Amino acid sequence: MTIQILSPQLANQIAAGEVVERPASVIKELVENSLDAGATRVDIEIDKGGSKLIKIQDNGSGIPKSELNLALSRHATSKLSTLDDLDAILSFGFRGEALASISSVSRLTLTSRTAEQTEAWQAYAEGSDMAVKVIPAAHPVGTTIEAVDLFFNTPARRRFLKSDKTEFTHIDEWLKRIALVKPEIHFTLKHNGKQVRNYRPANNQDQYLMRLAQICGKNFAEQAIEIDCQHEGLTLSGYIQSPFFTSPASDTQFFYVNGRLIRDRLVNHAVRQAFSEHGTGELASYVLMLEIAPHQVDVNVHPAKHEVRFHQSRYVHDYILQALQSALMQVARASISLPEEKLVEFVEDDWHSKPLSTGRVSEADPSNYATQSKFDEKPRESGSQGQSSSISAPSSYSRGGEYSARSQPELPSASEIASYTQLLKTPQTAQASKLVNSDLKTPMPPVLAGQYWVYAGDELSLLPIDIVAKWLVKRDILAKIDNGLVSQPLLMPVSIKVDEDWLNTIDEREQLLRQLGIEITIRLGQLIIKKVPPYLRQSQLVTVIPELLQWVRFEEPTHEALALWLAKQDDGKFESAVATWSAFSQLDDEIQQELAQKAKVLPWQSWLEEQLSD
């Protein structure tokens, strides 16, 4: 076949494959256009999950008659005109592909009127027909777009659509996300003629908290801590869960950059690292908005604009991490240091806080960042919360409501120290260890307290055995997961109250669950767990299984990620230090060194010398 230029119709349909994945994608593009046009109200109406009808009406600035035809052309946009504009994007749209792509896979009608026009005009385009018909119409100032029969001319794409309920769920989820970052906009959503969502404009904090409760749940809104931190062109605001929140949920995790919801590993790592000090980690709940100079972030990474790249990624990571750590620690410390009746107002180190009843944490002291230049790539070396520095362990509440300090690893007793010192001074002990393990490929180091291998070199160090054991479990899972893990029936099936979102997730991920060795059914409003792989038998299934379903609901995790997750859930202790060392010593030297670096190595030489000198 000879090389040739694609026809505009075919090019648009190919582009639609990137931009228009499902009805929710169409609504995302059209609503973002409404917001860029300055709309203060956006009404969304869909039929049959959006596959039959998608209708978006706004009160924005509208489109002049002379530009209606051009608006449906590919690479036509009002958002930018020069290369410099691409480096300073603050609008949602800028690629000029959405309307052309949508019109190529649906029957699209665009009706609009500007404030300067006395009448409205309507443009109609259908599928591969590039001709646009423009006729007079009746319409208030603003724009209405109707997309009917989505994918009517691409049957293969239409077959890949899920059930109406599933497609509606994706639309509803996206609307929640945009409603959180655009509180001043009035959003409504109708499905099959019935209004299902009505997010009224929130013009003050109390009204925003009502919207937050409507979307994220009343429990989160009541205990959330408000963040408002500014420094050197960066502003982090929003709400995070209290360190004492007992019901964190991974489905309440929203992060926005310049008003755009994004998925970014760097951001996720910073947030999870901050919350990991309080035991929540990946389950932490938050709604955070980062404002940054547009030339410091590249949003032109993905056609759907879900991803961004920061020009100074390390600086942004450390800024987010330190802001969240300071806020969480401030609340935890205040709960300890002040009597209950004085918890109404307090001032703590770097942060100035408003009354705890509002859960607000306000602007950070700029002196915390004084030693670091703007957008410096190097990790912070000063300040109390830098990535490379250590912080005090935050506090938490026990289930009984009383304060208890975060548990710390127990230090060896005096007798253990004496035994350990004697071990180091007596060569016969090491020789005995070699005799016991003479059948191993490499002699096993001495074992301390049944938990650590003792390495002697320039500096004594302890390698936790359970970390190596977990890695070996992960490797074992990876070797078996392709053919499916073995299921083990539970003696007594576990039942959980079902969430309606799980129905579609279980249906869509049935093969994945079977591959993991998990057998679950839904009966009488209960999720019944019948079989699980051996790695989950000792886990809290009422927590673990919902966590897994929430994870796979929007993602397709790799086998590597699934194996790591299962290994972390395996609460079984390693069989023995000798058996673990035997498996460890069979690995390649390269892998052994990599494991030793990843494991937590504890320097004990100086600590022991101090203890013995006392």
UniProtKB/Swiss-Prot annotation:
Residues 355-411 are annotated as: Disordered. GO terms for cellular component: mismatch repair complex. The keyword DNA repair applies. SMART domains: DNA_mis_repair, MutL_C. GO terms for biological process: mismatch repair. It comes from the Bacteria. One of its GO terms (molecular function) is mismatched DNA binding. Residues 382-401 have a biased composition (Low complexity). InterPro entries: DNA_mismatch_repair_CS, DNA_mismatch_repair_MutL, DNA_mismatch_S5_2-like, HATPase_C_sf, MutL/Mlh/PMS, MutL/Mlh/Pms-like, MutL_C, MutL_C_dimsub. The keyword DNA repair applies. Keywords: DNA damage, DNA repair. Belongs to the DNA mismatch repair MutL/HexB family. This protein is involved in the repair of mismatches in DNA. It is required for dam-dependent methyl-directed DNA mismatch repair. May act as a 'molecular matchmaker', a protein that promotes the formation of a stable complex between two or more DNA-binding proteins in an ATP-dependent manner without itself being part of a final effector complex. This is DNA mismatch repair protein MutL. It comes from Shewanella woodyi (strain ATCC 51908 / MS32).
